[in-house]
């Protein structure tokens, strides 16, 4: 009972860690694609998932998410909680496998490491199939082991045959479910097959020929059935990959790939110095090696027969070696067909529990030999995990921040503005968060190589007052930034924001106006030779002094200026905009940009009576204390000297 209580506690710990700051990150593009497919009818999900043409992932995870959303809704917290729950459940088979292939201590340590592993926590908090598939695979492998080790008939389990059948069912459902969630999980089927063969051979050597053959035949049937169930899916994947993937060299760059995996599966996200990364790689490799080499001394009573349990502890090392290295070997072979097999550590998420199992064995073996060394090693591993966990939610590690991008556009866009999303498919995450009335356009669906491809769609945006260009994933489809260049060559830049993975820029397509817009407070204050500040508006009247998402460390206050001239100004001037306190001390200064209005349309070219629209961002001192501040604007000559009086544009409340 104590063991089950401990495992339950580890599960609750894992769940708590995975629910912690669950919505700190915005959903990024891949996650919103999960929601897109999960929002389709189930029949459509399976049609697409079995052919792997429109989407490259199988249908099971999307189907589970479809049902989950039907029960709990589609908020960020709701859709991410499914992955958190499934990720936390991985602790249960990890503890069980560590126990069966080692001892109670190694099982407990393996479960603890799975609970706190930063890589597993990160992907448990993502609306994708990588962590759920890893959990399903763990349950499948655990079911295979337990089908061999079902207890003898007792008052607590009077029907061992039925129980054994249940474990075989778990093995089948786990392995098939893993592949139907994520294709690379198929790399574990050879692992299961070799486990079956090794266990059969060992039982034969133990003189249990009848039990060995019964186990082998049942296992062979289960694995054959699993293979038959996933064969159509694997054939579809093979057929599709042949036409789309680029071949590489078999086992090319394996050393670099393994080093990258070791760093990712221990530290995952920075900031880490090069020394810390190398130390983590060496430490992970050393612990893995110790887990493979050091035998555990003795076994506590397990509740199973001595003949059954006495050899599984000895087989733990070779079985775990197969679990870890065979998928890597298969991946190395498949590099000849697809050179991107090892491009992303997440592709092999299902291997992280194998590392945790080996690390748990290594720590248990060290503790048995030199107890102090075992405690020190455990403390070091936990310290690395905990520090790495704290890094998951740092601003520099944010996923694509579509929530922040959409919120900024929504709160700052005018009634006659337009939003241009580029490239076209990233409209899906943007529109998830954008609730403004402005139209959203996404005309560019192909790679852009010629400026002639850009102009016709963009000419249609000229009737709008300004165009918000929201860009992401442009490296492949617009490597020369043709869309942005077309806008920048013609219109002033009003603002630029840089949420993680995204660029937001506002271009003023109508910056020469016949009159002051009705929603702008009128000032009519003289600021320089023949120049009047007709109106001014402060868009961010309440703000903290710092910003962690769009342009850390300082917050920006956006200010709109509307100038008017009664006669042609004698020279070119620049606008000065500052934030000052009651004593006149400066706490914020405007940012100067090459493409701002007074450079695109300098004052010496102004026509009498026209209104010239200019927008600037005031960069705040990040240590600005909370309180009331004023935004003051004026003009300066080419030498930076003021040419008139400053005018109060509005007030800003700086808050904590």
Model-derived features with residue positions:
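Membrane-proximal helix-loop-helix interfaces that form the catalytic/acceptor-binding platform
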Residues: 6-149, 164-513
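Arg/Gly-rich low-complexity intrinsically disordered repeat tracts
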Residues: 150-157
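C-terminal luminal/periplasmic domains and tails of membrane-associated envelope-modifying transferases
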Residues: 407-416, 425-428, 440-656
